[in-house]
């Protein structure tokens, strides 16, 4: 028997869990609440889910000493029968209840599964990893919208969010397992702590080349200069982290010497935004986020994107042009990986934000310094070495998949558009 005060309720005789299920209809919760109100029970917990018009609701109540569990069961069942609903009842032992109360201080994490479409093998793979790591799933929510049966293979993207309780046996092994299964199943799986900052982040910093746009600008300029293959090979090695970024950038830049500056506009005209970029940034702006481009590319292209997308800040390299000709140099310091991290810190300070309130998104090894210090660092369609080092990665859906990592549903975001 549970005795004494419990959350301000009367002396308690028993704790009762009531489970109501059946076809959803208006008035079910009210009908059950009306019965319970006559017995002066205290509501300790309540929750419900509706899947394809099937309701499953749970109410945990403390029954006072003068109350009767059998009478409550009888009257609740009677009202449910009139609604063509069913009910189950469980008297919760004192020890079990106290254990439940004690769980409230335990760590909680969010596991987000993203894919073009989600099948049972994806759920099996993800939930096996969480179970093996001793994590208990408290809640599962579909964040993506409803889809028709026809054409599910061609739909945009799907997302399911798991709220899990506890700490993994090995955080490193968990992340490694999730990264491995993501590659095997062509899905993305994010794992992050469920903190107050998750939906209160306010600054998003993007890399530009191969992140917001689908190309490396310096490679495109090199094609115009007739040194495309040579520059592309250096770019690939730099993005994989095999060559120091500043060294590789200087080498590639020198090969552009003599290029007519009019070519910059030609290249800009053929650049394309990566999937989901415009939708993501519009949504972020509507939600009040500050956005910035911090790029090892060039200001000419960054400022063009700023105009198209409405980005708040742009930091990139200033290509030196003399008499309409590219000199093969930049003016000022080169924005390398460390400078990216420094600029992220400066932006956060200007906005009065902690680093926990900052999101960083990039694809290359030179993005890792800023990705690693941001509260939410995301490798987008990145090289394997970058994905392995970043806490989160997205490779199989568009940039707008980031909204799911922030906890927003399609229903939430569609209201903004």
Task: Kindly give the residue locations of the regions a language model identified.
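Active-site neighborhood of HAD-like aspartate-dependent phosphohydrolases
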Residues: 196-246
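Conserved active-site and cofactor/substrate-binding residues in soluble primary-metabolism enzymes
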Residues: 23, 27, 54, 67, ...
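C-terminal cap/substrate-recognition subdomain and adjoining C-terminal extension
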Residues: 258-376, 380-417
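Short glycine/serine/threonine-rich phosphate/pyrophosphate-binding segments
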Residues: 28, 122-124, 212-215, 367-370
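A conserved regulatory-domain signal marking ACT and ACT-like small-molecule sensing domains
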Residues: 2, 6-201
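Solvent-exposed alpha-helical segments within well-ordered globular domains of core cellular machineries
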Residues: 30, 34, 44, 74, ...
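Long, charged amphipathic helices and adjacent flexible linkers at domain junctions
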Residues: 95-104, 191-202, 235-264, 325, ...
């Amino acid at each position: 028997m549970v005795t004494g005060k419990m959350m301000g309720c009367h002396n308690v005789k028993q704790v009762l869990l009531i489970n109501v299920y059946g076809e959803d209809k208006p008035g079910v919760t009210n009908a059950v609440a009306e019965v319970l109100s006559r017995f002066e029970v205290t509501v300790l917990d309540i929750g419900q889910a509706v899947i394809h018009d099937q309701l499953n609701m749970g109410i945990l109540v403390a029954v006072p000493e003068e109350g009767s569990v059998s009478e409550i069961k009888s009257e609740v069942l009677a009202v449910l029968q009139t609604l063509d609903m069913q009910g189950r009842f469980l008297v919760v032992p004192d020890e079990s209840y106290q254990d439940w109360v004690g769980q409230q201080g335990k760590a909680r994490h969010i596991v987000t599964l993203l894919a073009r479409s989600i099948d049972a093998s994806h759920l099996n793979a993800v939930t096996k990893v969480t179970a093996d790591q001793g994590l208990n799933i408290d809640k599962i929510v579909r964040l993506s919208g409803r889809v028709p049966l026809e054409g599910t293979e061609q739909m945009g993207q799907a997302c399911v969010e798991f709220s899990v309780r506890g700490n993994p046996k090995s955080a490193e092994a968990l992340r490694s397992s999730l990264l491995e299964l993501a590659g095997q199943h062509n899905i993305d799986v994010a794992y992050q702590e469920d903190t107050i900052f998750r939906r209160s982040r306010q600054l998003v910093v993007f890399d530009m080349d191969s992140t917001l746009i689908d190309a490396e600008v310096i490679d495109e300029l090199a094609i115009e200069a007739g040194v495309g293959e040579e520059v592309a090979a250096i770019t690939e090695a730099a993005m994989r982290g095999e060559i120091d970024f500043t060294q590789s950038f200087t080498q590639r830049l020198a090969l552009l010497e003599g290029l007519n500056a009019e070519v910059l506009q030609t290249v800009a005209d053929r650049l394309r935004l990566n999937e989901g970029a415009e939708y993501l940034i519009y949504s972020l702006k509507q939600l009040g986020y500050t956005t910035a481009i911090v790029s090892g590319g060039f200001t000419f292209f960054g400022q063009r994107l700023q105009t198209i997308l409405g980005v708040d800040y742009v930091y990139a390299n200033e290509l030196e042009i003399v008499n309409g000709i590219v000199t093969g140099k930049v003016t000022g310091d080169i924005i390398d990986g460390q400078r990216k991290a420094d600029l992220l810190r400066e932006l956060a300070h200007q906005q009065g934000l902690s680093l926990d309130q900052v999101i960083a998104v990039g694809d290359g090894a030179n993005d890792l310094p800023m990705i690693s210090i941001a509260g939410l660092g995301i490798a987008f369609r990145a090289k394997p070495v970058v994905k392995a080092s970043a806490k989160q990665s997205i490779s199989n859906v568009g940039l707008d998949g980031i909204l799911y990592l922030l906890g927003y549903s399609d229903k939430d975001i569609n209201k903004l558009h």
